[in-house]
């Protein structure tokens, strides 16, 4: 399908009376302190090596020379000046990174596990469902009223199953791949076997089911225009009516949740090398420090993955890393070493694999602290030590995470943080408060066990 040009998109995309202007996309670049933000939504997180080279060139010419890997498996370019927006858009469209329809860009938020289709433990290949869903979303005009933040999650019992994202609509496979549990404005609770699901459906009708759900939601949106996400609807009395409407609208059976505890999801095999579902094939997982790449690192990454015997796409993970699939056994060591040389963490206990942060000050309007600088301090401090996953957020919005990390440091001022530990019993979205107004040095000492209270 021919991708629209920048000028065509300017004519076709209609303004809407909501806050979508604040949500980055390919054609909409809201302004931060450092310039416009362009979000490139990748189909199921996949990116070809030739596209990697093109993105590296684009950020060098039209942005700040950096590429952010997002926790939805997308890319983000920052520092885009107004006079460069059209040039950047047309460059990205020429790389095949645009949507099927202009308005469809906002609905490309479909996440699958980064090893979907290649995972040795998968119960079902969710890339087939995800690809069909992406096409339906981008070509069904009635759904264009939904929020650009409206997100979908499809898990297939992979070792890299996405367990830490709240989605508007989620599907999670049972052990044999025949059924999907489903839920809204939540995440699959694997600790209870997905007992929090609203019900289950036959996997063969997954896209039909989501279409039925969205049709019912759009009807409610017509009555209540502020309802453009499932989290809005769940707060209203109409939510129970919505659940009944789905049963009336969906032509196939909706059954009770299927309680299951997939063993594979406990592994979270995102960093290192692992066997694939395909015989004698392996995938490699790695993460750049703080989930960011320079243009030069992106070029070198493209060169490394292009040396494989195949040209299959790299996958961007929900932990701001990459998966290099379809490696032969004799390629593994070279690829791991080459990635490590250009700044990737290639071992799961590497500090750079476990420190996460947003853009922060001075780049973001809301940022109270330079979390990238402080995040790098933690990486350097724990260079030869083990650190649990920690999220440094420059404000309480916590854009990087929808659920608490093991530890969360919330900025209170430049270089100072309140430190939280994940705790399901806590009412705080970050967990249990451990200490207040710690300097980043004190945060490091606390995590290292050198201090217990300030």
What is each PLM-predicted segment?
Residues 65-69, 143-147, 218-267, 310-318, ...:
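Flexible, glycine/charged-enriched surface loops at secondary-structure junctions
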Residues 150-236, 408-454:
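Mobile "lid/hinge" segments at catalytic clefts and subdomain interfaces of large enzymes
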Residues 27-28, 171-173, 273-275:
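Short amphipathic beta-strand and strand-loop transition segments with alternating hydrophobic
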Residues 15-31, 97-98, 267-270:
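Intrinsic, low-complexity N-terminal interaction/targeting segments
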Residues 2-15, 35-180, 208, 286-412:
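Small-residue-enriched alpha-helical segments and adjacent helix-cap loops
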Residues 260-287:
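Active-site cores of enzymes that catalyze phosphoryl transfer or operate on phosphate-rich substrates
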Residues 132, 136, 216, 245, ...:
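Residues that form generic nucleotide/phosphate-binding pockets
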Residues 33-35, 188-193, 222-225, 278-282, ...:
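Short acidic (Asp/Glu) and glycine-rich catalytic loops that position anionic groups and cofactors
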């Amino acid at each position: 399908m021919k991708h629209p040009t920048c000028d065509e998109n300017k004519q076709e995309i209609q303004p809407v009376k909501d806050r979508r202007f604040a949500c980055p996309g390919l054609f909409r670049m809201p302004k931060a302190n450092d310039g416009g933000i362009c979000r490139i939504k990748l189909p199921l997180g996949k990116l070809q090596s030739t596209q990697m080279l093109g993105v590296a060139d684009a950020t060098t010419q039209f942005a700040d020379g950096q590429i952010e890997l997002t926790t939805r498996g997308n890319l983000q370019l920052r520092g885009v000046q107004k006079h460069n927006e059209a040039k950047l858009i047309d460059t990205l469209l020429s790389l095949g990174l645009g949507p099927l329809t202009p308005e469809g860009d906002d609905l490309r938020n479909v996440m699958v596990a980064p090893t979907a289709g290649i995972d040795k433990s998968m119960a079902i290949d969710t890339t087939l469902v995800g690809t069909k869903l992406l096409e339906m979303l981008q070509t069904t005009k009635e759904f264009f009223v939904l929020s650009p933040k409206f997100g979908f999650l499809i898990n297939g019992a992979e070792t890299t199953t996405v367990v830490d994202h709240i989605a508007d609509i989620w599907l999670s496979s049972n052990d044999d791949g025949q059924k999907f549990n489903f839920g809204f404005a939540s995440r699959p609770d694997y600790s209870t076997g997905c007992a929090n699901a609203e019900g289950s459906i036959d996997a063969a009708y997954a896209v039909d089911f989501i279409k039925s759900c969205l049709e019912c939601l759009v009807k409610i949106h017509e009555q209540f225009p502020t309802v453009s996400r499932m989290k809005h609807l769940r707060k209203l009395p109409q939510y129970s009516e919505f659940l009944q409407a789905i049963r009336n609208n969906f032509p196939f059976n909706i059954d009770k949740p299927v309680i299951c505890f997939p063993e594979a999801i406990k592994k979270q095999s995102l960093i290192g090398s692992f066997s694939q579902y395909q015989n004698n094939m392996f995938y490699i997982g790695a993460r750049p420090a703080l989930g960011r790449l320079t243009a030069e690192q992106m070029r070198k990454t493209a060169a490394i993955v292009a040396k494989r015997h195949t040209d299959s796409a790299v996958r961007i993970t929900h932990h701001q890393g990459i998966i290099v699939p379809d490696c032969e056994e004799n390629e593994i060591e070279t690829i791991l070493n080459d990635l490590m040389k250009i700044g990737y963490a290639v071992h799961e206990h590497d500090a750079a694999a476990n420190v996460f942060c947003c853009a922060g000050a001075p780049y973001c309007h809301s940022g109270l602290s330079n979390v990238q600088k402080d995040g790098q301090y933690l990486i350097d401090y724990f260079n030869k030590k083990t650190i649990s996953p920690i999220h440094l957020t420059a404000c309480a919005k916590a854009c990087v995470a929808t659920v608490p990390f093991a530890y969360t440091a919330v900025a209170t001022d430049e270089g100072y943080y309140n430190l939280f530990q994940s705790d399901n019993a806590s009412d705080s979205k970050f967990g249990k408060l451990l200490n207040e107004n710690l300097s980043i040095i004190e945060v490091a000492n606390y995590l290292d066990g050198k201090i217990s209270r300030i």
